Amino acid sequence: MYKRQVSKAVYESIKNSGAKIVDATCPFVLKIHKIVKDASAEGDQIVIIGNEKHPEVEGIMGWSETPVHVVDTVEKAEKLKLDKSKNVRVVSQTTFNYKKFQDLVEIIKKKEYNICISNTICNATEERQNEARRIARRADAMIVIGDSSSSNTRKLYEICKTECQETFYIQTLSGLELDKLKSSDCIGITAGASTPNNIIEEVYTNVRRKLCTDVR
């Protein structure tokens, strides 16, 4: 089985070796590969909103026939310089912070390039982020559950931390310090897409039982 979250060169190398390929890639990622491949073939400059070191972004970069620019901060967006005589195609890492994506795109748009923007953030990711933001605004404390290396969970943490100062990032129940939550009347819980349901339930049940507070 091959998850096509790598460059075109790697994909072609495996294909040419004669190995059987079972492509189990998320369709959202495949869509980005096609957008970048087709746009760059037309000579468009490619801008990816995302983390340059993330495997997904590294893979997307490999599908472009023209130079790729990766932007993930306001500073990089402001410093971005492109050829105004050529079209610009903007895509996003599927798990990128949606609000941050919008903010960075607005900065790039002000540069008056001939730009085409493709919001390629996964719908499920966007909905999860919006829900986490809504809960964090009403909570006294937030618990974000997920693997420390998970991109989408880190984004959830950043969003919650912005809305609720008392936000805690844990991988399992063992990482939760209940003493820090005792003064909270309302505690919100959210989790990354790949976090097992049993871990989420365990955290929820323990917080509810031991703190006897409003948990959302």
Regions found by a protein language model. Give the residues of each.
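Conserved small/polar residues in nucleotide/adenosyl-binding loops
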Residues: 1-2
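Short helix-loop-beta junction
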Residues: 15-20, 65-66, 105-115, 158-166, ...
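Internal gly/pro-rich beta-alpha loop/helix module
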Residues: 21-22, 35-41, 46-74, 78-82
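A general structural motif
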Residues: 69-75, 94-101, 120-130, 148-149, ...
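Short amphipathic alpha-helix with an adjacent loop that forms part of the alpha/beta core around
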Residues: 75-84, 175-183
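Internal active-site segments that recognize and position negatively charged phosphoryl groups
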Residues: 78-111, 132-135, 144-145
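Active-site rim loops that border cofactor/substrate pockets in soluble metabolic enzymes
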Residues: 107-141, 146-147, 154-169
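C-terminal functional extensions of proteins
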Residues: 141-151, 155-163, 167-216
